[in-house]
C-alpha cells in the first residue's frame, strides 16, 4: 500500500487535534480511508469519546513524512481535555473543507492570504497567549479572525486580555479588518449560550453574551458543518457583500446611501443586507436604522440553513425583514464551485521525492 496525500492529512489532523470524532473524520474523508489506517494500526478509536487518535506507529510515519510538526504531546484522557480537543477539531475540519490551509505551527504562517492557526499548535507547544480562550486564528479575504467556541455552559472570558493578545500577536500581519468568530456545532448551540439568562458577574470576566453586546469588532456566528464551510468560503472573497448583492439583485441593484454602511444595497426602496456572514449585530443595526428612516422592513439574503434556523424566526416572523435564500447559481457565480475542498487522491511524496508505503512501519 502506498500512502496518499489524503492518508497523510488524516494523520496530520490527529497530530494537530489529538482527538477527532469518528463521525467528523469520516465526514471529511471516506470510511474506507479511515478504516485502512486503523487496520494498519496507525490510528485507533478511543471508545469512551468515539474519537480517533494517533498511535506510536502513526506518529513515526508522520515524522518520516514531514520535517516540521507541532510538538508531540501524549493525549490526555481527562473528559474536559478530550472535549476541548474534539471541539478544536470541529473548527479545523470545517476550515479545511473551506479550502484554507490548516496544518500550521506559528503565527508567521498567517501572513499568507488564506491560513488557519489552531491554538493547540501555536508556537510548537509553547503558549504565548497566556490563559486566553481563543481556539484558532483565521486569515481569509480581507479579515483576520479570532475564533472562539461558544456553546451552552462554556463559561466566561477576560475580553480585554483576549483583544490585547489578538492585536499584539497579529499586528505585523496585513489584514484590513479584525473580527471575531463564535463557532459551535450549530447556530442553535451558539444562540443557546447567547440567549441564556446570564448570572451577574462580580469579576473582570464576562459572559459571551456580554462580549457579544459590547464588542466593537465585527462578530460572525459559524456552525461547524457544510453551511459553515460555505460561509467561510464567502468570507474569503474580498468585498463579498457587494459582489453577492450585485449577483443576486442584478439590474435591480441600487447602491446604498453613503452614510448607511450597514446596508449592502437598496432593493425596491428597502434596505438590502447580505446576511450570509451571520453578523447578527449588523442586521440588528440595519433594522434599527431602517426604522429611524421610516422604513418598516429590510430585506435579507442568506444561506438556506441560516434562514431556516435563525433568520426566519428572528426577523421574518417578527415582521422586521423579508428573508430570501441565496440560490446555488448565485453561489457558483461568486465561488466557482460550492463543493467542499477535497485533497487529491494521489501518492504522497516526501521532500526527497520518495513515496511512503507500509514496510517502513515494520521497523521498531
Locate predicted features.
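Long low-complexity, intrinsically disordered regions
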Residues: 140-146, 151-235
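A short, surface-exposed helix-loop junction/capping segment
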Residues: 67-78
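Long, low-complexity interaction regions most often at the N-terminus
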Residues: 91, 125-137, 174-178, 198-200, ...
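Non-catalytic C-terminal interaction segments of nucleic acid-processing enzymes
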Residues: 2-4, 22, 195-364
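Short amphipathic alpha-helical interface segments
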Residues: 1-28
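Exposed, interaction-prone assembly regions rather than primary DNA-binding/catalytic cores
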Residues: 76-174
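Accessory beta->alpha helical hairpin/"wing" motif in late/C-terminal subdomains of nucleic-acid enzymes
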Residues: 44-69
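Short amphipathic alpha-helical interaction segments
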Residues: 26-44
Amino acid at each position: 500500500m502506498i500512502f496518499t496525500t489524503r492518508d497523510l492529512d488524516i494523520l496530520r489532523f490527529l497530530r494537530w487535534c489529538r482527538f477527532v470524532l469518528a463521525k467528523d473524520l469520516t465526514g471529511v474523508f471516506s470510511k474506507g480511508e479511515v478504516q485502512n489506517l486503523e487496520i494498519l494500526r496507525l490510528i485507533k478509536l478511543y471508545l469512551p469519546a468515539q474519537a480517533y487518535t494517533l498511535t506510536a506507529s502513526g506518529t513515526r510515519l508522520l515524522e518520516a513524512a514531514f520535517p516540521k510538526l507541532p510538538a508531540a504531546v501524549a493525549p490526555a484522557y481527562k473528559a474536559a481535555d478530550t472535549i476541548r480537543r474534539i471541539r478544536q477539531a470541529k473548527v479545523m475540519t470545517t476550515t479545511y473543507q473551506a479550502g484554507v490551509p490548516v496544518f500550521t505551527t506559528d503565527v508567521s504562517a498567517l501572513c499568507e492570504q488564506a491560513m488557519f492557526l489552531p491554538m493547540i499548535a501555536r508556537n510548537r507547544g509553547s503558549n504565548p497567549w497566556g490563559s486566553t480562550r481563543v481556539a484558532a486564528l483565521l486569515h481569509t479575504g480581507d479579515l483576520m479572525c479570532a475564533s472562539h467556541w461558544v456553546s451552552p455552559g462554556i463559561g466566561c472570558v477576560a475580553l480585554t486580555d483576549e483583544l490585547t493578545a489578538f492585536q499584539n500577536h497579529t499586528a505585523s500581519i496585513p489584514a484590513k479588518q479584525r473580527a471575531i468568530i463564535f463557532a459551535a456545532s450549530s447556530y442553535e448551540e451558539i444562540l443557546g449560550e447567547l440567549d441564556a439568562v446570564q448570572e451577574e458577574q462580580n469579576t473582570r470576566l464576562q459572559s459571551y453574551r456580554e462580549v457579544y453586546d459590547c464588542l466593537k469588532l465585527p462578530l460572525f456566528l459559524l456552525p461547524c458543518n457544510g453551511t459553515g464551510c460555505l460561509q467561510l468560503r464567502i468570507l474569503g472573497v474580498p468585498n463579498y457583500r457587494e459582489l453577492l448583492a450585485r449577483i443576486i439583485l442584478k439590474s435591480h441593484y441600487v447602491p446604498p446611501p453613503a452614510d448607511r454602511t450597514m446596508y449592502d444595497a437598496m432593493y425596491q426602496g428597502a434596505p438590502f443586507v447580505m446576511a450570509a456572514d451571520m453578523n447578527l449585530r449588523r442586521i440588528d443595526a440595519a433594522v434599527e436604522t431602517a426604522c429611524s428612516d421610516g422604513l418598516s422592513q429590510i430585506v435579507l439574503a442568506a444561506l438556506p440553513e441560516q434562514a431556516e434556523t435563525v433568520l426566519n424566526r428572528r426577523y421574518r416572523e417578527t415582521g422586521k425583514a423579508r428573508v430570501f435564500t441565496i440560490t446555488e447559481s448565485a453561489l457558483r457565480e461568486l465561488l466557482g464551485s460550492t463543493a467542499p475542498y477535497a485533497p487529491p487522491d494521489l501518492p504522497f511524496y516526501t521532500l526527497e521525492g520518495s513515496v511512503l508505503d507500509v514496510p517502513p512501519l515494520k521497523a521498531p
